Amino acid sequence: MARDTGGNVASGLIVVDKPGGLTSHDVVARVRRLAGTRRVGHAGTLDPMATGVLVVGVEKATRLLGHLTLTDKEYQATIRLGQATDTGDAEGTITSARPAGHLTLAQVQAAAAALTGEIQQVPPAVSAIKVKGRRAYQLAREGTPPVLEPRPVTVWSFTVQAVRPAQAGSPGPSPGSSPGAAPDGSPGASPDGGPGDLLDVDVEVRCSSGTYIRALARDMGDALGVGGHLTSLRRTRVGPYGLSVARTLDELASELTVLPLAEAAAEAFPVRHLTAEQANSLSHGGRLPGLGGAAGLGEAAGLGGAAGPGEAAGLSETAGPVAAFAPDGTLIALIQEEDGVARPLAVFVP
């Protein structure tokens, strides 16, 4: 376990491969016990049924988390066509059921294509979005699901990998969660998922933060006229952090792998090198002259050649946070350039 000179767990990121059945907060609680500190948070909530990459910050790295959630994400998912649920996933109650066995691969691909690009997405009613100070899921559980407004999201790719008949016993709402006829009065498909009634669609999605894969499943089903919900979800990447660097909770219990703060910032953000004078000023909350683009951005000194993601791309001053490093490779702050001035978003020293 990496610790600082005072014997405390070192500041940094822990990339967890979250198991199904745990909330993101459950994972944070486990990491708090493993790290011996309460200063732990996570970036980008995963639903309990979902598995995969959950980025957890420890100590000073918790200040990175609010900015990491702005990055794009990748998922592998299975969508069940022929049943809609009140939550948009397999943990909900079936609200409608229609035969989907007649659908072709081309039709499913067309529905996915229509949900690709910059779209307006209505979040699921059972979500953590706040409505007049309360979470939407709380209102939904009380029998008054809120009407949520569409939000702009970007789906860079929505790839259909396979379309297959749903198998009996495969993940989905329990057969007893809905009658055979759909509540909306349509004849409906059997909730048991009889032969030809239901289709499972395996997809890969790359999307912006804030995109609900449950909503993509719902909207695909609606577009095809049969309803749809999510039966499995695995997040394979958040920004630069993929499954290859993720560790299970059991693995972390054996060895707590912490990505050091400076290295984590260099991987997640473009890098700006500072003079000693600039580093001192910024560490005390001072502002710096802006660069007006990518000039001066590149590899972080003393980080083994790690390069920030903005090194090769010409960045505008509105591109997002930049990691500012002192000449000795110490991460000083995240900065944002606006109107020709770079101001600190989060300072990490002293």
Predicted regions, residues:
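Accessory RNA 3′-end/elbow-binding domains used by RNA modification enzymes
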Residues: 1-19, 25-42, 46, 50, ...
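RNA pseudouridine synthases
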Residues: 2-168, 196-215, 219-244, 334
